[in-house]
Amino acid sequence: SKKFFGPAHLRALHLIERNPGINLGELIFKLKVTKQSLNRVLRDLIKSKMIKQIQDENDTRKKNLFLDKEGKVFFEIVYNSQKKRIFNALKNSSSDSVIKFKNVLKKIIDGK
């Protein structure tokens, strides 16, 4: 049975998928979380074989994070499911609603 992953797990998976080889410090910075809270999430993801840590070749103190096979499959399922839901919602909306939605998304992305 699959373990339940919360929003923190999904955010970490997403960033690791988008930035293969990201190290712990970079991930903490991008997620704006404490090392302690991220460690719990990473422990869960490693135990579930979603991600793997590989020691940095240039700096042995650093560990680089990558999606494992299981993590790649899981990410694709979640991503495709979300993509389908968004596509269907936009397809069944008026052009005015779509424009308003794009404006809201832009504000979210810009942090306003």
Set out the residue ranges of the language-model regions:
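N-terminal helix-turn-helix DNA-binding core of bacterial DNA-binding proteins
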Residues: S1-T34
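Flexible interhelical turns and helix-capping residues at alpha-helix boundaries
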Residues: P20, L31, K35, Y79-Q82, ...
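Short, hydrophobic-biased segments on the C-terminal half of alpha helices
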Residues: L24, L42-R43
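Charged, amphipathic alpha-helical coiled-coil/dimerization segments
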Residues: R43-K100
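C-terminal regulatory/oligomerization modules of transcriptional regulators
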Residues: S95-K112
